[in-house]
Amino acid sequence: MEKVIRLIVLTLFLVLADAITAPAQTKAGKYAVRLTVTEKGTHEPVVMATCSLDPLGAVTVTDADGKASVGNVPAGVYRLKVSYVGYEEYVSNVKVGSDLALAVQLTPTSLALQEVVVTARQNASGTSTSSKIGRQAIDHLQAASLADIMQLIPGQVIQNTDLTAQQNLQLRSLTNNVTSAFGSSIVVDGVPMSNNGVLSAGQFSPTAFTGTDLRQIGADDIDNVEVVRGIPSAEYGDLTSGLVVVHSKAGVTPWQVKGKINPELQNYSLGKGFRLPRAGVFNFNFDYAKAWGDPRQKTRSYGRYNMSLGRGYAFTRHWHAETKLRMLYARDWSGNDPDAVDDGSYWKNKNLSFSLTHNGRVSVGKPLMRTLSYTLGLTLSQADSHNSSYVSVSSGLLPIITALKTGYYSVNWATQSYLATGITESRPGHFFAKATDAFFLKAGNTRQQFKVGMDYQYTWNSGRGFYNADDTRPYRANNNGRPRAFSDVPGIHQFAAYAEDNFTWHLNEVNVLRSQLGMRFTTLQPFGDLATYALSPRLNLSFAVTKWLDLRGGIGLNSKTPGLDYLYPDKKYDDRVAANYMPQDNPAGRLLVYHTQVYEVEKSKDLRNATTTKVELGIDVKLPGNRRLSILAYRDRTPNGFGADTEYFTYRSNVYTTASGLIATPGGATVIDYDNPARSDLVFMTTGKIGNTNTTVNRGVEFDFDLGEIRPLRTSVYFSGAYSETKTWNTLYKSKSVPSAYLPADYSANNVTPFKLVYNNYDYDKYRRFVNTLRLVTNIPSLRMVASFTGQVIWQDYRFNYIANVSPVGFIDTNLNYKSITDNMLNGYLDLNGNYYAQKPTGIHCIPVKELAIKTSDAVPERQKPTWNLSGRLTKELGKVGGLSLYVNNMLFYEPYLRANNNTTTLTQRNTGNFSYGVELYFNL
């Protein structure tokens, strides 16, 4: 730990030393840039507009008169950017050689403009591989949540809006991978949406597929989104895979009423941004959505209420802040159709969440502290889940086991099915604080923008946890799960520090070197027995070889800390029959006794952060006519993802019969002599340990081709796609019990094994996909209308669940000792005590070793035939009053009958569920 801290301090010292020792600028060599920002046409001042000078990273905000200034700017040429919600971003090159006073006019966003952007735009070379999606693209897409916006990213498959199913972020991954979903980061207005406080209990696995639900974020309150697929800035952490940065609306906007309707969804919103003298700018948004899985049956539904209230204001001339309060209420439900008989079975989940975010920016103007930014965030959630279903009795009687401690228990039983309800009450909370110091330097032809900062997070869960509505009728009877109090689990602290240098070097007028070099240090529960530490160096590079060709690449490390569920797994329960005496002529003497074994799963002291190494290499080509081509190859490897760890312990479980142990009295109760069992079984049981046992490798090639505009048709053409491969496997050995066919009858009858066989694990799952997307966007400014047609082809959809043919390499005996099985032992025999014999002995039950091999014959890759989808969208502005949008997905209703895959001749209907249509109408008041 001390070495790690020393390394971090040294890194920060070197960054600061680099800044201090850089050639000093004289006061005369630094200038002020003063801005006056107004609306084009009305010349009204634009308040709280964000102004930045790149690549120096100097950022400021306009005041009540629309004025802003940036001081101490070294001489040189910079790119000035001015942005505000509802306006086109202003971008211009500014040559600074003296004090400047600039007048900037912002143009309101409108379809009457010559250029309309309704697609995702690639980020500049030399920074993280990412796509930016603006408000116009979100409106044209008619997105209902953040999940819908993701389909604009290269390689993503076009799908219908479906709010009835949980939507998680899976970038560059072709399967619902646990670590990928858990390691995706969603940052809203500077505060990450943490899922570290999620806990499980009952029948749920602590390694279940988890991730932030994208349905929670309504699309109508979003101003813009940045989706980072590559190596992120060192400013962002606690992630392994993708990063999505969401900026909500902030600024003066008219009253806007929106409504979107399709057969499965109704979504309405109301929003307004207004300014109060001396109080700042206020923003209000309310969103309601209701969705059904199938409107004909309505067996699944989802309802969402989102409300936000924000304020932007200035404490002083140099201190600007934004505060936003959000409320979310969401309800998932599935059950019987309203027209069907209501048998009482259903599932519902309610989520009520309040979040408060506060972002501030102080223009300090010092050499080593140009701008000080800070973020504070607090989220309190209440998630209640109710599961109600019938528990069936299939074997005459069903034991009702509720024991929470190890021992022998006389249990009641049910003889007929009953309706049971299981309830989970979760109360996760998350606090976040962050501070960043930004400053810049210029020396000759080089410019450097530095970021140095730290953040802190605290996550907890104070919920009641899982419990049964009626303990005499448990939801999962005779099951491993038992009630669990989430409030018993302690919270977790996380600290991080980071430093980053964005470097630009103009070697000449053509050749430019850009780099983003950063280091991030993350620690969880520092100095405690659960402490984890991780260093995450990150580098993005680009070099302009010619005016039309850029080479770029990068390598970086991401790190995800384990959440509460991984650090504090639930107890393990195992229940075995100890006595089952059911005399027909003596009801009073009937007795059912179970032995319950409880294993107190230790907290995960050996668990490490899941880390992903990202490597990228690509080219950016600028072609005549504003055409552009980007090609990127990537490889993301996570060698230590979270998963179950195979670890055993053994225990004794006694069985009592009338021959030994049970004392039956005619007409009276039956009692047990626990010291006189008829049989004592030695049972293997897993401990429930969590480890870094999963490895995932994602690799592929992405491309994005802007083919420019066909001017006579006013149509822009965009062609993108990706070839992706995901391979995932378990790094642990495989283990299993001895097959019952090679054991005496009493072993299989009593469900025990003499030892556990161990095999090398060569199994893996591999997925491949090759997808192309062609978009035609036609803009007609005179009609205030834009139309787009999107065609997508999935050329390859490949899946291979490989199971290797392997022989045992060892076994774990009843003393939990591992004993090897070498190659020259495969033709021998093992007795029930694990003793090896080269020749089969007489009079001893033995197991032929070669028969214990795992042999498979059906591990064949599955390949599906290509399918395609064609969708159309139209957006029309109705002057300044409002607008109308229409869309049709799978507009040719292409649902062919094709072979399911290459391994079968059965025809199945493909591309089903993709046909949809809808309309959106909005009014500006």
PLM segments and residue spans:
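N-terminal periplasmic "start-of-domain" segments of outer-membrane beta-barrel proteins
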Residues: 50-54, 58-67, 115-144, 165-170, ...
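Extracytoplasmic beta-strand/coil segments of soluble accessory domains associated
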Residues: 147, 151-195
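A beta-strand signature from Gram-negative outer-membrane beta-barrel systems
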Residues: 104, 211-256
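Short, acidic, small-residue-rich periplasmic hinge/interaction motif at the N-terminus
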Residues: 30, 36-42, 47-54, 83-85, ...
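Gram-negative outer-membrane beta-barrel transporters
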Residues: 637, 654-808
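Short acidic/polar hinge/loop motifs at secondary-structure boundaries
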Residues: 71, 191-228
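C-terminal beta-signal and adjacent terminal beta-strands/loops
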Residues: 792-853, 864-866, 874-925
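Face-selective signature of the C-terminal outer-membrane beta-barrel domain
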Residues: 314-330, 347-528, 700-702, 718
